Design a protein with these regions (language model features):
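Active-site flanking loop/helix segments enriched in acidic
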Residues: 2-26, 58-68
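Short N-terminal amphipathic alpha-helix/helix-capping patch enriched in small hydrophobics
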Residues: 20-31, 44, 49
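Amphipathic alpha-helices of TPR/Sel1-like and other helical repeat/solenoid scaffolds
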Residues: 27-33, 78, 82
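Short, hydrophobic transmembrane alpha-helix segments
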Residues: 34-39
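Divalent metal-dependent catalytic cores for phosphoryl transfer on phosphate-bearing substrates
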Residues: 40-125
């Protein structure tokens, strides 16, 4: 049920912004289906789904700091927000580290270094 708890936490995080909530649910759904179809291990699938749910967590702090949701600002500010949330929900350190990396690079298409990254990018389109 950790995934449900994370989705609920992100719904709370984006309270008042239904388009962001709908987007994270869409990206999570696409990533989940693609990951299952690709035959990811249980651990890889969890990491992918967590990343898909929090991938845009940097939008809110980017708006607050820069009055913009530019992808580079999301990549700059998103990892710290993701780490804070995932620690609060007791995710393990290795998962948090990789998810923070993915959040910090999900608008950088020239550095794709794994299937989780590739699927996240594709699900986000």
């Amino acid at each position: 049920m950790k995934i449900n708890d994370l989705i609920l936490a992100m719904i709370d995080f984006y309270q008042g912004h239904p388009k962001q909530i709908q987007h994270l649910i869409k990206v999570h759904s696409f990533a989940r289906v693609i990951g299952i179809d690709e035959g990811l291990s249980t651990q890889e699938q969890e990491r992918l789904e967590v990343a898909a749910i929090v991938h845009d967590i940097g939008i809110k702090p980017a708006w607050e700091k820069y009055n913009s949701s530019n992808g580079k600002y999301q990549e700059e500010l998103g990892p710290a927000e993701a780490i804070k949330l995932l620690n609060r929900l007791n995710y393990d350190e290795a998962l948090i580290e990789r998810v923070a990396y993915l959040v910090g690079h999900h608008h950088t298409y020239s550095e794709i270094d794994g299937l989780d990254y590739q699927i996240l990018v594709e699900a986000d389109f």
